[in-house]
Structures are given as C-alpha cells and as structure tokens.
C-alpha cells in the first residue's frame, strides 16, 4: 500500500511541475502575442508622441515583429519602416529562439500534462 502511495505522490509532483511550466509558458505566450495590449500601450504610454512616429507605423512594424516571433514563421525579419543593424538582427534572432523554445515547451508540457 505504501508503494502505491509513493508512486501516486511522485506522479502528482511531476504533474504539478509540468502544469506549472505549462502555465508559465502560457502566460508568456499570451503576453507576447496579445497585440491589443501593445496597441493600448501605444496610446496610454504616448509612444507615438514620444517617438514622432504615427500610430499606424508603430503598429505595422510591431505586427511584423510579433509575426516573426512565432514558431510557424520561418522567414527573416524585415521591418518595413526601420533599418536594422547586424547586432540588432542577431538580437532578434536570439529572442526568436527563446520564444520558439517557450512555444515548444508549452506544447510538450501541455501534452504530457493531458496524458498523465
């Protein structure tokens, strides 16, 4: 009887860890890909006024950047209204890899949690 309790307890702990990672990844994904939050911030933080760029230009370039971060997008990052340095390009490639790992971890932990 004690062996069953121990196996069950270990399973519960592992499931809790997978669910925790799943929820953290979900929170990151929602925050990054929820464009309306940034659209709100353009006005709320007065980004257009402080940069001298129109809301439309900021939003269009942000949309391109967010699309680039998706695991499903395999092209290069080309912002329509901004020139990017080589170090800037490297930075965004590294950030994309981080977000891809978060998206993969989200899917894997979700599947594992569902079948446990």
Identify what each model region corresponds to.
Residues 52-71:
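Short extracytoplasmic
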């Amino acid at each position: 009887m004690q062996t069953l309790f121990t196996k069950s307890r270990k399973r519960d702990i592992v499931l809790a860890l997978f669910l925790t990672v799943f929820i953290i990844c979900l929170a990151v994904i929602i925050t990054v890909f929820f464009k309306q939050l940034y659209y709100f911030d353009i006005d709320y933080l007065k980004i257009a006024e402080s940069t001298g760029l129109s809301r439309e230009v900021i939003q269009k370039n942000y949309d391109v950047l967010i699309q680039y971060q998706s695991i499903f997008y395999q092209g290069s990052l080309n912002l329509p209204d901004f020139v990017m340095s080589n170090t800037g390009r490297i930075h965004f490639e590294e950030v994309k890899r981080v977000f891809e790992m978060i998206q993969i971890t989200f899917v894997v932990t979700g599947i594992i949690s569902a079948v446990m």
